[in-house]
């Protein structure tokens, strides 16, 4: 193996997959922990629509969060998509949401905040036993999020 550095190859392409619109319940705070305030948000139903995946969200998912001392929200969401053909697809996503303190305060109050004003990104993995969706078990996706008062919108992009 040579240790000579060479130029990096072009980055992988991001291919639009789907948009997820998820209803969210009220925030539940569990109190402080060693890494910050522990909390969760129950996930309700929603819609999934896009060029590669369409369906609905199965009610009952959860968005686990740690509100860190540095103002970053550490997110770990777990939910299920029911594809239009009835197949169930488990979704796990982990990521971060942060921005200037005044922007995050507006989000917390349920005000409309433009997505460009804060950072909301997750890495997404899928698991399914449905043969027609088996390719999802072998890929990673990135989601760009937008939070509203009672709704989260996620734009999923498959890493090619």
Which stretches of residues belong to each language-model region?
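Beta-strand-enriched cores of mature, soluble protein domains
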Residues: 2-160
């Amino acid at each position: 193996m040579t240790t000579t550095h060479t130029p990096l190859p072009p980055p992988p392409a991001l291919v639009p997959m789907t948009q997820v619109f998820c209803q969210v319940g009220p925030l539940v705070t569990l109190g402080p922990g060693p890494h910050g305030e522990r909390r969760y948000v129950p996930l309700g139903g929603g819609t999934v629509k896009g060029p590669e995946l369409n369906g609905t969200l199965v009610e009952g998912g959860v968005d686990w969060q740690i509100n860190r001392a540095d103002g970053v929200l550490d997110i770990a969401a777990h939910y299920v998509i029911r594809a239009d053909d009835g197949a169930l697809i488990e979704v796990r996503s982990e990521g971060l949401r942060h921005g200037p303190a005044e922007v995050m305060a507006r989000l917390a109050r349920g005000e409309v905040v433009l997505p460009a004003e804060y950072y909301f990104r997750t890495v997404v993995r899928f698991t399914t036993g449905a043969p027609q969706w088996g390719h999802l078990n072998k890929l990673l996706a990135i989601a760009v999020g937008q939070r509203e008062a009672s709704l989260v919108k996620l734009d999923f992009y498959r890493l090619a």
